[in-house]
Every structure is written in structure tokens, then in C-alpha cells.
């Protein structure tokens, strides 16, 4: 047993290091803000996510045209934007990662995406987040703080969106 204890300690420490990183949580002392990075619009202009959200709660979906899982979420995001987000001080925003705006615009048109789209052509936004994985979902409160980060659109992200909307101004 004496030889096993150091091995077990190393094994437990290694297993703990392999977990996914903790999602950023907004706190009164040090909220994690959305990166102030310039993103392309589908028309080729530039803006920042905070400017597009304009003081509204935002559900942000990071995606790519080649991502099959991302495509499965898009119909749900269209419905969410048309029902839950509309009229409640919230907005759904898609951010394509690593592609050029013309390609993304054509894809969005073919897919019938009605929610706002931005493009992170040079990975500056996702690199500032420390997260290149797609699909990924963020919920951003009215003050630009990231209050939820997850791998995909699911019950946890929808609950975070509901809480952020309910929190009011």
C-alpha cells in the first residue's frame, strides 16, 4: 500500500487537471467582460459585440459553416430569437469563427438565419476568450459581463439567459 499512495495522489491530481476550464462567472468584484475586439459584419463593416448587443442581454453562439453540430442549433436559435429574445430586452447573435464574411453571408442566406451574425475572421475574439471550440454558447448580461459559457445550446444556457433577462437593467 505504501507504494500505491504516491501513485494515487499523482493520478488524482492529473485527473483534476484534465477537466474543462471553469466558466467565467460575473461577480461584483471582477466581472469577466466580453472582449472589445472588432468583428466583421456580413456586409464587411466592423463592429464590436457590445455595440451590437446595445445594452441588451445576448445569447452568443460561436459557430462555423463546416460544423455539423452548429447547423443543428441554428433552427433553434432562429426560433429563440423570434420568440424568447424578441421584446424581452435580449438578442441572439451568431459569431462565425475563422471564415470570411462573404462565405458566411451566403451560408446564412441559404440556411435562412434571421438572427444577427458577426464574423471573427482572424480568431481575435475567440483567442481573447481562450476558447476556439465550436459550437460554444455565451450568455452576456446587459453590462457586457459573461455570465455563462457552455459547449452548446442546452438547458443550462437557456436558464442562464432566462436569469439574465429577469435580472433587469
What are the roles of these predicted feature ranges?
Residues 54, 106-113, 121-166:
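Thiol/disulfide oxidoreductase modules built on the thioredoxin-like
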Residues 56-58, 62-66, 133:
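Short pre-active-site segment immediately N-terminal to redox-active cysteine/selenocysteine motifs
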Residues 59-60, 92, 137:
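Hydrophobic beta-strand anchors of alpha/beta hydrolase catalytic cores
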Residues 71-111, 121-127:
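Structural microenvironment flanking redox-active thiols in thiol-disulfide oxidoreductases
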Residues 1-40, 148, 156-163, 168-169:
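N-terminal targeting signals for export/organelle localization
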Amino acid at each position: 500500500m505504501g507504494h500505491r499512495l504516491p501513485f494515487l495522489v499523482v493520478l488524482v491530481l492529473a485527473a483534476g487537471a484534465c477537466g474543462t476550464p471553469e466558466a467565467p462567472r460575473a461577480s461584483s468584484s471582477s466581472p469577466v467582460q466580453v472582449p472589445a475586439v472588432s468583428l466583421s459584419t456580413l456586409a464587411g463593416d466592423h463592429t464590436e459585440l457590445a455595440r451590437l448587443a446595445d445594452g441588451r442581454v445576448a445569447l452568443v453562439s460561436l459557430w462555423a459553416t463546416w460544423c455539423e453540430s452548429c447547423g443543428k442549433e441554428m433552427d433553434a436559435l432562429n426560433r429563440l430569437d423570434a420568440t424568447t429574445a424578441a421584446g424581452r430586452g435580449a438578442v441572439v447573435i451568431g459569431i462565425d469563427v475563422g471564415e470570411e464574411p462573404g462565405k458566411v453571408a451566403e451560408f446564412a442566406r441559404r440556411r435562412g438565419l434571421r438572427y444577427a451574425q458577426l464574423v471573427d475572421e482572424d480568431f481575435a475574439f475567440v483567442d481573447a476568450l481562450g476558447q476556439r471550440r465550436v459550437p460554444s454558447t455565451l450568455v452576456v448580461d446587459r453590462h457586457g459581463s459573461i455570465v455563462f459559457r457552455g459547449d452548446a445550446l442546452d438547458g443550462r444556457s437557456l436558464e442562464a439567459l432566462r436569469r439574465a433577462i429577469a435580472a433587469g437593467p
